[in-house]
Structure formats: C-alpha cells, structure tokens
Amino acid sequence: MGGISIWQLLIIALIVVLLFGTKKLRSLGGDLGGAVKGFKNAMSSEEDKKALEDAEAAKPVQTAQTAQPTQQATEKKPESNKEQA
C-alpha cells in the first residue's frame, strides 16, 4: 500500500519510451553522462589546485638575506719618528 510496485515502474518506463523514443532517450543519457563526467573532472581539478596551493603555502618562505656591512681593511701607517722625538 502506498509503495510503487515493479509493474507500475514498468508502465511508467513504457510511457516514457513511447513519448520520447529510444533515440532521444539515448542522446539524453549520453548528455547526462557527459555532464556528470565534466562535473567530476572539475571537482578533481579543484581538489588538485587546492592541494597544490596548500603545498606551496607549506614551503618555507625564503627571505632576502640582509647584507652585513664589511669593514674595509685599511693599512695603518707606521708612525713617524717625529712624534717620538
């Protein structure tokens, strides 16, 4: 009671085939399958893109090394004897 039996489903399927024809149903099925395949490809490419972004974010960021000031070597002039005398 209240449920759909197998006979009712077969009658509905027969009416649909008579209304649309087998060629139209076959093309609709192919279109539907292509849409589902495209949706799955888009979802997997988004997941791959997200995983790639996460991997790039996990990499340590290389910072520019600051240049340390270097002391120039200057030769110390020998003191002349004038100052000592």
UniProtKB/Swiss-Prot annotation:
Residues 58-73 have a biased composition (Low complexity). The chain crosses the membrane at residues 1-21. InterPro entries: TatA/B/E (IPR003369), TatA/E (IPR006312). Signal peptide: none annotated. Coiled coil: none annotated. GO terms for biological process: protein transport by the Tat complex. GO terms for molecular function: protein transmembrane transporter activity. Residues 43-85 are annotated as: Disordered. It is a single-pass membrane protein. PANTHER family: SEC-INDEPENDENT PROTEIN TRANSLOCASE PROTEIN TATA (PTHR42982:SF1). This is Sec-independent protein translocase protein TatA. The gene is tatA.
